[in-house]
Regions:
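Iron-sulfur cluster-binding cysteine motifs and their immediate structural context
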Residues: 29, 34-46, 52-90, 94-112
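Hydrophobic membrane-targeting signal helices
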Residues: 21-31
Length: 486
């Protein structure tokens, strides 16, 4: 059954005589029900203030699918005593993807976007992640794996966005910083292996369950984190726009990005770098709610912060970040672009949950690992914690297949995932440049604004830090300041 029917696509967006309900009618239990009763044996007790996920009580059948995937695949539920702690959530949305009754959903923020577009004092900017053009066609009867970037750009302009940018631009920026950081770590033999840090669900998982390993995370912001920072600084300066009047909207396949954009570590000059995140689902809902055809108008991205390499587009698929990083790391270390075998790096492509390879860069053998889902990541984390890990660089994504299988995407069965992977690989192979360091806009932004990877400006706007969040596992009552009895 397709996801529109399975998750009651229209019903969950337009409720009660067509009036739009922002955020849905998520489950709002009492404190007693949420933390202390055995009802959580039948469903995940999602808290009302969860920024990414909502639960619709009336639709829940108690099938336990949400618990099963959270416990067995993402290794969250069951790693703490649900009867005595917060409901711990990494916002990956696996529970949404596995709920067959539409009882779990992303928190809706698309009406906030409509409100911003309708405000004449605001400049509303959309940034499109690479998995969105590879997935949205499923909602409109277009074959899976069709890459529809120009369709989405035109549709966003019909919705009223002032600018439509390519988040792949900042994927290239991420690789410039991450490859530089990897080279420094290899040379200094410090905090190895290096973990990728562009998946916020994966980052939060480490912060909660493996806080002693947070120093292994790359300090580079995610592409969306960098995109927002550059929109509010570099883009605003070049366009002569007051950044306080900008509403930056990330359109992504990911529910965890709704959480990520709230992290204080990603603020830019006292402002949120990204003001709103909506999923592929929500973009489709917006278009349908305003009777806008997806493919009625085809236009390219705005060219300023709208140009990306093929490597940047690979961020949407498992192994893509690793492939892109290896290409630029090879150039940084040897001064030459990599040979064909490293350009493709087929050993880390595909839908196996854990893949490994050894790559030769300038006479140095670099061992890399790529995985998705926390059950696979946990194997590597335990190796790192015990000192037995043989890898130098590890990429982790929370969702099956990477971002293309995100919880905000249409149905992600094997056929759809493979079609989307093929689409992104094709876009990469046909790109004008396949190397982040050759993107002319990336060259310009370093010349005009950043300076070089690892510079003071880079550290301020393109890097972040991580914190120990293991306190979330402590009993809820120990964290509450109860008023003394009178």
């Amino acid at each position: 059954m397709d996801k529109i029917n399975r998750r009651n696509f229209i019903e969950k967006a337009l409720l009660y005589n067509g009036s739009i309900v922002l955020g849905g009618f998520w489950f709002a239990p009492t404190l007693e029900n949420l933390f202390f009763q055995s009802a959580s044996d039948y469903y995940l007790p999602i808290q009302p203030n969860n920024p990414a996920i909502a639960r619709y009580e009336k639709k829940c059948k108690g099938c336990r699918e949400c618990i099963a995937v959270c416990k067995d695949v993402q290794k969250v539920y069951g790693n703490y005593k649900a009867s005595k702690t917060h409901h711990v959530c990494i916002h990956c949305g696996a529970c949404i993807s596995h709920c067959t009754y539409g009882a779990m959903s992303e928190k809706y923020n698309w009406q906030d976007v409509i409100q911003a577009i309708d405000d004449p004092s605001k400049i509303v900017i959309a940034s499109i992640s690479p998995s969105v053009p590879a997935g949205i066609g499923d909602y409109f009867g277009i074959p899976s794996g069709s890459y529809l970037s120009e369709d989405i750009t035109g549709a966003c302009r019909n919705l009223g966005f002032d600018y439509v940018l390519d988040t792949n631009f900042s994927a290239d920026l991420t690789i410039m910083e991450e490859a530089h950081e990897l080279q420094k770590r290899i040379q200094g033999k410090s905090n190895m292996p290096q973990f990728t840090s562009c998946c916020p669900a994966w980052v939060k998982y480490i912060e909660i369950f493996y806080p002693s390993l947070v120093n292994h995370l790359s300090t580079t912001r995610s592409p969306i984190g960098m995109q927002g920072a550059m929109v509010k600084t570099y883009f605003a300066q070049k366009k002569g726009i007051d950044p306080h009047n900008i509403v930056h909207v990330a359109i992504a396949p990911c529910t965890a990005k709704k959480y990520e954009i709230t992290r204080e570590e990603l603020m830019t000059n006292g402002m949120r770098s990204t003001d709103i995140e909506i999923t592929t689902d929500e973009l489709a809902i917006m278009l349908k709610s305003r009777n806008i055809e997806l493919s009625a108008r085809k236009e390219p991205f705005d060219q300023f912060m709208g140009t990306a390499s093929g490597a940047g587009k690979l961020f949407g698929t498992t192994g893509g970040v690793m492939s892109a990083a290896i290409r630029t790391a090879h150039f940084n270390i040897t001064g030459k672009n990599p040979p064909a075998d490293l350009l493709e790096l087929k050993q880390i492509q595909g839908l196996e949950g854990l893949k490994t390879a050894t790559v030769n860069i300038g006479g140095t053998a670099l061992k890399v690992a790529v995985c998705y889902e926390m059950r696979n990541a946990q194997v590597l984390l335990d190796q790192v914690a015990s000192g037995s890990c043989e890898y130098d660089f590890i990429e982790v994504m929370a969702c099956k297949g990477g971002c293309i299988g995100g919880a905000g995407q249409p149905t992600s069965d094997i056929n759809n995932l493979e079609a989307r992977i093929k689409a992104l690989n094709t876009v990469d192979s046909q790109a004008a440049t396949r190397f982040c360091h050759e993107n002319p806009e990336i060259i310009s932004i370093y010349k005009d604004f950043i300076g070089k990877p690892g510079s003071t400006v880079s550290e301020q706007y393109l890097h972040t830090h991580f914190t120990d969040k293991s306190s979330l596992l402590e009993p809820i009552l120990a964290q509450m300041q109860l008023e003394p009895a009178v």
